[in-house]
Amino acid sequence: MMFPWKQLILLSFIGCLGGELLLQGPVFIKEPSNSIFPVGSEDKKITLHCEARGNPSPHYRWQLNGSDIDMSMEHRYKLNGGNLVVINPNRNWDTGTYQCFATNSLGTIVSREAKLQFAYLENFKTKMRSTVSVREGQGVVLLCGPPPHSGELSYAWIFNEYPSFVEEDSRRFVSQETGHLYISKVEPSDVGNYTCVVTSMVTNARVLGSPTPLVLRSDGVMGEYEPKIEVQFPETLPAAKGSTVKLECFALGNPIPQINWRRSDGLPFSSKIKLRKFSGVLEIPNFQQEDAGSYECIAENSRGKNVARGRLTYYAKPHWVQLIKDVEIAVEDSLYWECRASGKPKPSYRWLKNGAALVLEERTQIENGALTISNLSVTDSGMFQCIAENKHGLVYSSAELKVVASAPDFSKNPMKKLVQVQVGSLVSLDCKPRASPRALSSWKKGDVSVQEHERISLLNDGGLKIANVTKADAGTYTCMAENQFGKANGTTHLVVTEPTRITLAPSNMDVSVGESVILPCQVQHDPLLDIIFTWYFNGALADFKKDGSHFEKVGGSSSGDLMIRNIQLKHSGKYVCMVQTGVDSVSSAADLIVRGSPGPPENVKVDEITDTTAQLSWKEGKDNHSPVISYSIQARTPFSVGWQTVTTVPEVIDGKTHTATVVELNPWVEYEFRVVASNKIGGGEPSLPSEKVRTEEAVPEVPPSEVNGGGGSRSELVITWDPVPEELQNGEGFGYVVAFRPLGVTTWIQTVVTSPDTPRYVFRNESIVPYSPYEVKVGVYNNKGEGPFSPVTTVFSAEEEPTVAPSQVSANSLSSSEIEVSWNTIPWKLSNGHLLGYEVRYWNGGGKEESSSKMKVAGNETSARLRGLKSNLAYYTAVRAYNSAGAGPFSATVNVTTKKTPPSQPPGNVVWNATDTKVLLNWEQVKAMENESEVTGYKVFYRTSSQNNVQVLNTNKTSAELVLPIKEDYIIEVKATTDGGDGTSSEQIRIPRITSMDARGSTSAISNVHPMSSYMPIVLFLIVYVLW
């Protein structure tokens, strides 16, 4: 036993090593694993991994087969961190079991065992194999005899030459246990050379044996014989938990035996079991305890059967059920550490301390894997490992034991400075200093020791319990803690207050959606205490942020009233006001019932359907605390715009009725229905839609609309209509009956149009008179029968082009660029339809008729004016009528010559003289050229400068008098007139507003005044035109 002062010195030394960092023993992060190194690998080294964490950082060493590896002596070994690197591995020196040791100042741990093996495959000996001679029908076994090797192998056989491998089937089998080739019944095609191919599953190296010749004997064919099992599994085969077990079975025989499997106990195979290689292999993946037992292979042919039996035994490596964990425990206390593992056979246990076997003594005992150490000392600290093992493996569990010794210390677990309780309550004052071993405690109130009595008692953990607290118990309490390493004190101040009471509690209320309400919660409390109001809604804390638009706390310091605005159905439920102080808490609850419009009805069904009715039933939904008064039904079809309220029987559905018949439905239409409930609050949410149903078929009732027609080609009667919408077709097989007859005839001609979307029908017959009237009607039908016809309407047959030309065609020259063509209309009976107008064709004498220009006039016009023509040139023209079918023949051609062009010389030397009411104009006479029209007169165009309306004065003289109020500026032009049109305009004259009694001007110099050599007032009778 170490003296207390020595233990304290040791603890202080360890604390200095750690500084402020927390000391920690080694803990493995990576441990080495079993490895197989391929002999001859290009990689010239192998690494066994080992890494541990700890503070201080661990250092490492390794053992091979239980002996330390001396890194300074063995140049082939190298440490890289904690990893062991083996350079140029050698199977003679390096094969074995490796373990890693990680050590720091707190102890040592040992890794799991890792086996290093070397995989190799040597060559077959070059030795000729003897010829195998058998009879036809006899079975044979060709031996492989693999060369020396290490590591798992796979086998195959070559027949004669590579790459012709033997294909396994019910007659031929290659054992992956022995490598031998088995042929149950030899056939002539089997004669040849057989070579065993052995492949390493680790290195992929492949070697070939010497060929074995197989020949047939000449002394006859082997007769039939019963099966002889040549490939069978061991009588007892251990199988590991979770492994894949493969049992081989193959027999020789004639005829070829059939292989079957079964369990000896008669239990069926589990679904995971697979039969492979034509039942020659039974495979059990993920082997478990229930897969253990006896298995039988039955080989059978017509000559008999043979059975091979074997037992699979289950084993499991140790697996931890309970690991050990780090423990920190006080000196002189006792340690009980239990580790438990499962496995078969049952594991045994041993313990290590700091990497070495734990030495048992009087204080240290191991029983059933559990470690007990009594009267702990600091020197018991270290790294411990529990090892569970059976013959199939072992597992390690590591943990650190820290044995601590310290004087009482309140710094890590200080006492509460203030404890508040209410009168009459029970209070416990804690006193739990950190101390190893645990400290003994005593108490003082002020300077007086606290003695135990019926209300005051000392707790086992050192705390003080006071029952039925009074005001006199208030004060300062000191806990004095002591062990063999020292003592310490802690203080708590106890405050005793009056209890909190709710003076105005919330009460049950009944409200409607949209209203607002206040739930009161007012209290009386000790003035020394702060108070907190908390509201709970249906057991959850009321969320004033998320539901801030509805919830708000109102009231003063002693009030926590809850206002709920614009109440919704979701606010219905239980409300609890929780009042908390630092000492106590009280609460009061109230139920709030919110009445709202009904919830959606449920389970809407269509119980019966006809062509125009549907009988519905439903179940009542939530009434939301207000009884349902009535129901309404809505329907929707693929053709409707949203949901529509429908007519029902009864017309008004009261709240106690849960069935109704919908009427006035369209036949053969797919409907959905939903139900809406209403109460005093209003209409609720609609139910979910019913399943889609289709009404029954019926005879159609609605004929097509907009029956009309006309147009088309020669000898056609075109009849058109608007198709009947699908929702009004009332059934399948819908179509149209088109009936027509010439006006005045009694017998109808009928035809059927089978497409419901067709909008027209064309009747063709050479006897149809163009543009003749027909009476037309269109009916409907479907598979149920014929429906009504539309009202009779008149439709005209197709037109033909007119057959006669217009008469009395004449042409008149209007100017140098215009002529007017006129004619008489053609008779209506000869128009062969509705006359649309006339087409005028014209060309000049120098052109060709084929390149003539054309102009159309609509309706019954009997003249046309042709513009943009060339002057003084002969033009030819003809006219024909046209309708929608085309144009008729042209009239006889007439000709006319356009007039000469107007003079190109404008009126010159225009002068003016103005008074306050008159303007006198003079200009020089315009003389026409030989190729121009003779001047017949003049036109004077005048307007105010602020307007666009032009007025015209016609005169046959070279002067004119304008009576004008000269109140603003005037713009004046002069043109010569001829039969060929108006000549070129003079320059514009601007006559300014008169400010003096007399003003003069001319086109040559408008700003100068030109005296006239002679002046004669001329009184003119004027004709004024407004030019556009």
Curated annotation (Swiss-Prot):
GO cellular component, one term: extracellular region
Record domain Fibronectin type-III: where: 600-698, 703-800, 805-901, 902-998
Region (Disordered): 684-713
InterPro entries listed in its UniProt record: FN3_dom, FN3_sf, Ig-like_dom, Ig-like_dom_sf, Ig-like_fold, Ig_I-set, Ig_sub, Ig_sub2
Tissue specificity comment: In brain, it is expressed in frontal lobe, occipital lobe, cerebellum and amygdala.
Lipidation (GPI-anchor amidated serine): 1002
Glycan-modified residues: 65, 193, 375, 468, 489, 765, 860, 895, 913, 931, 956
Subunit structure as annotated in this protein's UniProt entry: Interacts with PTPRG.
PANTHER family associated with the record: CONTACTIN 3B-RELATED (PTHR44170:SF18), PROTEIN SIDEKICK (PTHR44170)
Family: Belongs to the immunoglobulin superfamily. Contactin family.
Physiological role: Contactins mediate cell surface interactions during nervous system development. Has some neurite outgrowth-promoting activity.
Protein name (record): Contactin-3
Source organism (scientific name): Homo sapiens (Human)
